[in-house]
Design a protein with these regions (language model features):
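Short acidic, glycine/proline-rich loop/turn micro-motifs
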Residues: 6, 68-72, 287-289, 321
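Conserved proline-anchored active-site loop of SAM-dependent methyltransferases
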Residues: 1-3, 41-42, 52-70, 102-108, ...
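Short, solvent-exposed loop/turn segments at secondary-structure junctions
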Residues: 20, 62-65, 109-110, 143-144, ...
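C-terminal target-recognition/interaction regions appended to catalytic cores
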Residues: 212-358
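Class I S-adenosyl-L-methionine
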Residues: 1, 8, 47-54, 68-267, 355-358
């Protein structure tokens, strides 16, 4: 999805994923995959597998990949995580004089706070030691898509033109706290990247849904069971709708009176909740439609999930719903990548053109 977001102006020289479902999906959507895609554990790759010197290296990995277990072993030691496997390659490229001009590390917002901020500091230290300056931006896909999906984008570069440094709404409180927790030697490499806010989102969840007669709805009994999982506050949200309303429902585990209780929570703000990889029916997001005093419910379809990630309907999804939702729920929002590329990454690669355009 990062490749689609970057756009046709970029050429992908190398891509890697160890997940067979994601690998098959990549091949199905990119006819040139055989030229550069490697379906392998990142730890089995060598610098010789990466051609030339890239303008950009992009890494998306689970938050737990920044575990201190990897840092304690040294950033080049042990098969601790996908990220450290990636970083081992970046170090080797740097040693060979082929370090990427830019890097982006994309992750969940927990990266900023995990292990009391020590994991974020470990990432910053790794970048700083190799001569990169870096800064973090917390961007919620809800700025451009009807899905609440906050993510952190750590952007690293060897040079930082003055016109790309400044204030940004994406310097959230969490980013500022993470920055404040960096060791002084690492903080000296920090950059407050200037990134403008994109135009206001002009679509909502209902606009991306498939027609009512093209989807499978829950039985009345199943819908009632879903409603019974709601607290009085959330049931009231259903009951107070006076006209057709479309909402998103997540099942969550809440602690109530010292016990773990499964709850269904509904929102009618035009946004879906953050898509997740499915681990059974309870983790799949549901849709409710309230109309004429009646409530209907169903599961979000794979195509709807893909639309919530900004993917075109021409994007080929895996055949099974579970696999398709896994691909969508583990991806990066396409329009967010495009905005980041247009407003920051591309100007970093061509600062003269960026300054002339201002």
């Amino acid at each position: 999805m990062a490749r689609i977001g970057l756009g046709d102006g970029w050429k992908c020289a190398f891509a890697n994923d160890f997940d067979p479902v994601k690998a098959a999906t990549y091949r199905a959507n990119f006819s040139d995959a055989a030229d550069h895609f490697h379906e392998r554990d990142v730890w089995t790759l060598s610098p010789d597998d990466l051609p030339g010197r890239a303008d950009l290296a992009w890494a998306s990995s689970p938050c737990q990949d920044f575990s201190l277990a990897g840092a304690r072993a040294g950033l080049t030691g042990g098969r601790s995580s996908a990220f450290f496997g990636f970083w081992r390659l970046m170090e080797a490229l740097d040693d060979a004089g082929r370090a990427p001009r830019l890097m982006v590390v994309e992750n969940v917002t927990g990266l900023l706070t995990s292990n009391g901020g020590a994991d974020f500091a470990a990432l910053g230290t790794a970048l700083a030691v190799r001569g990169y300056r870096f800064g973090a931006l917390e961007i919620d896909a809800a700025t451009v898509l009807p899905q609440s999906r906050p993510r952190v984008f750590v952007v690293a570069a060897r040079d930082a033109p003055a016109n790309l440094i400044g204030e940004s709404t994406f310097h959230t409180r969490a980013v500022r706290v993470a920055h404040a927790g960096l060791p002084d030697a690492v903080a000296a490499h920090w950059i407050w990247w200037r990134l403008a806010s994109p135009p206001a989102r002009n679509t909502d969840l209902a606009a991306l849904l498939e027609p009512d007669d093209a989807v499978i709805w829950h039985s009345a009994a199943k819908t009632q069971r879903l409603i019974e999982l709601m607290t009085p506050l959330h049931r009231a949200r259903l009951e107070t709708r006076s006209s057709r309303a479309v909402g998103a429902v997540f099942r969550r585990t809440r602690i109530e009176n010292g016990r773990s209780i499964q709850r269904a929570e509904v929102r009618f703000d035009g946004l879906a909740g953050c898509l997740r990889t499915p681990r059974g029916g309870s983790s799949r997001q549901a849709i409710v439609v309230v109309e004429g005093g009646q409530v209907r419910s169903r599961l979000l379809t794979p195509r709807e999930a893909a639309r919530l990630m900004g993917l075109p309907d021409s994007y080929r999804l895996p055949a099974t719903p579970t696999a398709a939702l896994h691909v969508a729920g583990d991806g990066v929002a396409v329009p967010v990548v495009r905005w980041l590329a247009r407003e920051l990454l591309e100007p970093l690669l061509n600062p003269a053109a960026a300054m002339a355009a201002e």
